[in-house]
A protein has these predicted regions:
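Core segments of transmembrane alpha-helices
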Residues: 105-107
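Individual transmembrane alpha-helices with interfacial aromatic-anchor signatures
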Residues: 158-175
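Juxtamembrane helix-break-helix junctions at the cytosolic face
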Residues: 110-125
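Short, Lys/Arg-rich, polar N-terminal cytosolic tail immediately upstream
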Residues: 1-16
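Interfacial segments of alpha-helical transmembrane regions
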Residues: 17-35, 121-133
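Juxtamembrane loop-transmembrane helix junctions in multi-pass integral membrane proteins
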Residues: 12-22, 90-97, 117, 121, ...
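Solvent-exposed, well-ordered loop and adjacent helix/strand elements within mature globular domains
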Residues: 33-102, 135-152
C-alpha cells in the first residue's frame, strides 16, 4: 500500500511539474494577445488621448510631450468624441506620435515574451522589459492625480479609492508578479 501511495504521489508531482511549463507558456500566449492588442490600440486617437494624464504627469515620460502637464486638462476628450481644436492641440503636443511609438514598444515586448516558448534568452529579455514597463506603469499611482477618486464633496475620495484609471494601473501588479517569477 505504501509503495502504491508513493508511486501515486510521484506521478502527481511529475504531472504538476509538467503542467507548470504549460501554464507558463499559456501565460506567454496571453501576454502576446494582450500586449499586441493594447499596443495596436495606441494607434487609435482615443487611446492616445486617454493616456495623456499618465504621460504628462510622469517625470520619466513627460518630456515626450511638448505641452506642460496641467494644460492637458482643457483638451481632454471623451472616448469617441471629436473636437477639431482639441485634436489639433494633441497633434501639437505629440500625443499621437508618442502613442504610436509606445504601441510599437508594447507589441514588441509581447512578441519577445511569447518567443520565450522557443528561446529562453529571448523570453528573459521580454520578461525583463515587461518588468521595466510595469514598474513605469505602477509609478502612475504616485504621479497621476486622476488615479484616485477626487474630492468633489463626497466623503469617498483619495487613497485607497481608485478611479477607473487607477484600477487600470493597479492590475499590472499581477503582470509584474508573473514576469518576476518567469524571469527565474
Amino acid at each position: 500500500m505504501k509503495t502504491k501511495l508513493q508511486n501515486l504521489f510521484m506521478a502527481a508531482l511529475t504531472l504538476a511539474a509538467s503542467t507548470q511549463k504549460l501554464g507558463v507558456n499559456l501565460i506567454r500566449v496571453a501576454i502576446l494577445v494582450i500586449f499586441v492588442w493594447i499596443g495596436g490600440l495606441k494607434f487609435w486617437n482615443y487611446e492616445a488621448e486617454g493616456i495623456v494624464p499618465f504621460v504628462a504627469n510622469s517625470p520619466f515620460m513627460s518630456f515626450f510631450y511638448t505641452k506642460s502637464a496641467p494644460e492637458y486638462k482643457e483638451y481632454k476628450l471623451k472616448e469617441g468624441e471629436f473636437n477639431e481644436a482639441k485634436h489639433q492641440w494633441h497633434v501639437e503636443n505629440n500625443t499621437y506620435g508618442f502613442s504610436h511609438g509606445l504601441g510599437i514598444l508594447i507589441m514588441a515586448i509581447g512578441i519577445l515574451t511569447f518567443l520565450g516558448i522557443f528561446s529562453p534568452k529571448i523570453g528573459l529579455a521580454g520578461a525583463a522589459l515587461v518588468i521595466v514597463m510595469t514598474m513605469g506603469t505602477l509609478s502612475f499611482l504616485v504621479t497621476t492625480p486622476e488615479v484616485w477618486v477626487p474630492d468633489l464633496g463626497s466623503e469617498e475620495h483619495g487613497f485607497p479609492l481608485l478611479t477607473g484609471a487607477g484600477r487600470l494601473v493597479i492590475k499590472d501588479t499581477a503582470c509584474l508578479l508573473y514576469t518576476s517569477d518567469a524571469a527565474d
